[in-house]
A protein has these predicted regions:
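Membrane-cytosol interface segments of multi-pass membrane proteins
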Residues: 1-186, 230-234
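Alpha-helical transmembrane segments and terminal signal-anchor/GPI-anchor hydrophobic tails
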Residues: 181-241
């Protein structure tokens, strides 16, 4: 049976990390720190524009997270017929695992920013401690605090909280969930709510995982030429992600 395996997930994560590095290092002149960078064979403006577009790495991480969460829940509840207590425990376990995984790199980065005088938190011992604690648990953005990681860390928690609700909506409305999410998303984007940039990813990842879209795409043979078929499938799958 053809499956979108953990190995495939790690490969996509590797691509997303490459996007992340390009975006943070080369999307703006100020981010190069005055260093002379050669973008050969591309013109510098074009290379920087491509790097700027790689901000979609956050969306890729969010997609993979929800995709994995859906498969995990589906393995236990094929019909997604779980109750509120089960959903709460599922989110809580994932949240604890998420926080513990982030503990070492977070503490390390806080230490480095303190030593290099690039600290992101407000002045004052008490305010710093409160901000660090809220940031670590992913709730800094919710309470208006300063954050060391300004996007995907708090977003990972918000996506986790949305997931059980989105899954129940999908259970009832199937693919229509994407249209249902687009309506509030379009309204909130006008209000400059950061989460809505990635809100559409949640139902899409759920649909892709449940309907085995990648598995079907992998077994799809659109052209007689194997090489051209692989290239076409690569283009289609990249566009989907």
């Amino acid at each position: 049976t053809i499956k979108f395996t953990k190995k495939n997930t790690l490969a996509v994560k590797g691509i997303a990390i490459s996007f992340l590095l390009c975006y943070h290092c080369f999307s703006q002149t100020a981010r190069m720190g005055g260093a002379e960078v050669s973008f050969w064979p591309l013109p510098q403006n074009l290379a920087m524009l491509i790097s700027l577009c790689m901000v979609h790495c956050v969306g890729m991480f969010a997609f993979l997270s929800v995709y994995g969460l859906t498969l995990s829940m589906k393995s236990k509840y094929p019909e997604y017929d779980f109750d509120g207590h089960t959903a709460t425990l599922f989110v809580l376990k994932r949240y604890v695992k998420l926080v513990l995984t982030f503990l070492v790199p977070f503490v390390f980065c806080v230490g480095v920013t303190f030593v290099t005088d690039t600290f992101r938190y407000p002045a004052g011992m008490f305010a710093n401690i409160i901000s660090i604690i809220m940031d670590f648990f992913g709730v800094g953005h919710m309470f208006g605090g300063r954050m060391l990681v300004s996007t995907w860390w708090y977003l990972s928690l918000e996506v986790l909280l949305i997931f059980p609700v989105a899954l129940q909506i999908y259970r009832k409305y199937s693919w229509l969930i994407m249209m249902l999410f687009l309506l509030p998303g379009s309204f909130l984007i006008e209000k400059h709510v950061h989460l809505t940039k990635y809100l559409f990813i949640v139902p899409r990842a759920i649909c892709f995982a449940d309907q085995q879209v990648f598995e079907r795409l992998k077994s799809w043979k659109p052209l007689k030429s194997q090489a051209l078929s692989k290239f076409l499938k690569f283009v289609v799958s990249t566009g989907m992600i």
